Amino acid sequence: MYHQLILMALIGVIMANVVPFSMSNIPEEYKEFIPEEVKNFYKNLTQEDRQILRELASKHATFTNEDAALEALKNKSDKLYQKAVELRNFVKAKIDSLKPDAKTFVDEIIAKVRSLRPEDGQKLDMEKIKQAARDIIAKYEALNEETKEELKATFPNTTKIITNEKFKRIANSFLQKN
């Protein structure tokens, strides 16, 4: 179960760092698990910034990749673009510091999480999210101990999150098969 909690926290961290992503899409009971860097990014947004992010998030399917989304953001607001790039670089530096096995694992999680984004006007599909979490947990459990330790060291907020009793209850209930 400990490994599952690590993975759920890691998924949360990565989901929160996918740009553009709206904090309003995160249920209140999960917001406490979002890293401070991400909270600060969204907390310091103006109403205009929020509107720009909502507009771009609604068009996420039209962007071929993250760079295209950032370019669209730059065209709307250079200041917001700079903030987003700073947040992206923070996450990218952590990921780039990983050894190949850990980096591949994180890259796969990011791709999986991005694939879960709903189309315009659609809600998140909780069953797809649960299945994705199960798939990621299986991949995590197949990693060697050195890679698991590296992931824990690189994402220290995960340790704080997984020791939180509330998070453990949420993770257990979330992954229950219906």
UniProtKB/Swiss-Prot annotation:
Disulphide bridges, residue numbers: none
Compartments (UniProt record): Secreted
PTM annotation: N-glycosylated.
Record InterPro entries: Gp-FAR-1
Gene3D superfamilies in alphabetical order: 1.20.120.1100
Record: glycosylation sites: 44, 75, 157
Principal subcellular localization: secreted
Coiled-coil zones: 67-89, 123-154
An example molecular function term from Gene Ontology annotations: fatty acid binding
Keywords, in A-Z order: Coiled coil, Glycoprotein, Lipid-binding, Retinol-binding, Secreted, Signal, Vitamin A
Signal peptide residue numbers: 1-16
Gene Ontology, cellular component aspect: extracellular region
The family this protein is said to belong to: Belongs to the fatty-acid and retinol-binding protein (FARBP) family.
Stated role: Binds retinol and different fatty acids.
Matching PANTHER family: FATTY-ACID AND RETINOL-BINDING PROTEIN 1
Protein name, as recorded: Fatty-acid and retinol-binding protein 1
Origin organism lineage: Eukaryota, Metazoa, Ecdysozoa, Nematoda, Chromadorea
